[in-house]
């Protein structure tokens, strides 16, 4: 390692977690955010010998990351409830949609030690990130830089490679568009009451017992449930119970195993589904099936975002690829 390489690593490595969060806010995708951070570090390393210290290394890295995200910007990512349709019938077949870019959760484990880089954990709630995706990419960047990261108007303009007046205009339009779009964010896992923690535990236990009636009792009466990449969503504890009875491949107690985790700062549960072992070892193996992110409002479990086909997300969360 050269002196320049060592200097680059010592100056930029501590910023990785917050840059990952920034790229996630911009992209709405945990897996894309990883790629965007890698591209950010590659560009920064190539340009480090030209860095003159006119701004802090942190501001410089955010400028690079922001422009990487703007260059890579695609169609906005959404959750099923954000598509604007009516609640679905739980008795109708569920069919995944590959025509929509779906929002992904971000496992907290990907952000490293909870005691470090607190800024990485600001503004990453699912409702907030979903609301951000509604904005044009440049407005999204302006809002994140000013209102989440608390950059100055001049720093924001520099990161966006535009004038202060233009950056302020983008910020004003973003604030007007987003309104209270993130107002229904749930309680963070670290702030749950004892009652809410108990409901979280009971949610996991009920699915492991295949106790659908128990799941219904745990949910708020008007709870909502979504399962990207399934485009439909469901309203009401009874409807959600019917969905679980008729559509879930688990049939008996023990088919599912649940591992509590945290995503986007919110309580979550990694769901593993029993499958015959394919390695000739005999017995059963439980494989990643679903990642449930829970929203608690006023002490009740009011919403579940259940992400299907979550193997990559399990890896980001530091969860095992299988259970035996």
Where are these regions (language model features)?
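Structural recognition of an alpha-helix C-terminal capping motif at a helix-to-coil junction
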Residues: 35-42, 55-67
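Solvent-exposed, charged amphipathic helical/linker segments at domain boundaries
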Residues: 153, 158-159, 164-255
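A short pre-motif secondary-structure segment
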Residues: 142-143
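Low-complexity, glycine/alanine/valine/leucine- and proline-rich hydrophobic stretches
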Residues: 241-324
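Amphipathic alpha-helical segment used for protein-protein interaction
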Residues: 101-139, 194-197, 201, 205
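Arg/Lys-rich amphipathic alpha helix in sigma70-family domain 2
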Residues: 52, 66-85, 89-96, 180
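A short, charge-rich alpha-helical start-of-domain segment used by transcription regulators
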Residues: 1-21, 31-37, 45
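Sigma70-family region 2
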Residues: 41-57, 71-78, 133, 181-185
């Amino acid at each position: 390692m050269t002196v320049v390489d060592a200097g680059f690593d010592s100056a930029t490595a501590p910023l990785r977690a917050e840059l990952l969060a920034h790229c996630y806010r911009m992209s709405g995708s945990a897996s894309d955010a990883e790629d965007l951070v890698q591209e950010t570090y590659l560009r920064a390393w190539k340009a480090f010998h030209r860095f003159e210290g006119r701004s802090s290394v942190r501001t410089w890295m955010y400028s690079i990351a922001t422009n990487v995200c703007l260059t890579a910007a695609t169609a906005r990512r959404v959750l099923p409830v954000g598509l604007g349709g009516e609640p679905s019938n739980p008795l109708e077949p569920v069919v995944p949609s590959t025509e929509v870019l779906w929002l992904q959760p971000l496992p907290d484990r990907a952000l490293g030690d909870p005691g470090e880089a607190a800024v990485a954990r600001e503004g990453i709630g699912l409702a907030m990130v979903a609301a951000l995706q509604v904005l044009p990419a440049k407005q999204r960047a302006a809002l994140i830089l000013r209102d989440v990261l608390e950059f100055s108007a001049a720093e924001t303009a520099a990161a966006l490679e535009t004038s202060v007046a233009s950056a302020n205009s983008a910020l004003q339009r973003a604030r007007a568009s987003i309104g209270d779009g993130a107002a229904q964010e749930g309680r963070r896992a670290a702030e749950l009451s004892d009652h809410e923690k108990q409901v979280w535990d009971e949610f996991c236990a009920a699915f492991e017992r295949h106790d659908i009636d128990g799941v219904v009792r745990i949910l708020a009466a008007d709870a909502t449930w979504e399962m990207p990449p399934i485009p439909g969503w469901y309203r009401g504890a009874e409807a959600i119970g019917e969905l679980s009875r008729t559509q879930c491949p688990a049939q008996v107690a023990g088919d599912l195993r649940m591992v509590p985790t945290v995503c986007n700062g919110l309580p979550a549960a990694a769901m593993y589904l029993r499958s015959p072992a394919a390695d000739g070892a005999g017995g059963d193996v439980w494989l990643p099936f679903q990642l449930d992110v829970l929203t608690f409002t006023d002490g009740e479990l009011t919403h579940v975002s259940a992400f299907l086909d979550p193997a990559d997300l399990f890896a980001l969360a530091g969860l095992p690829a299988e259970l035996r």
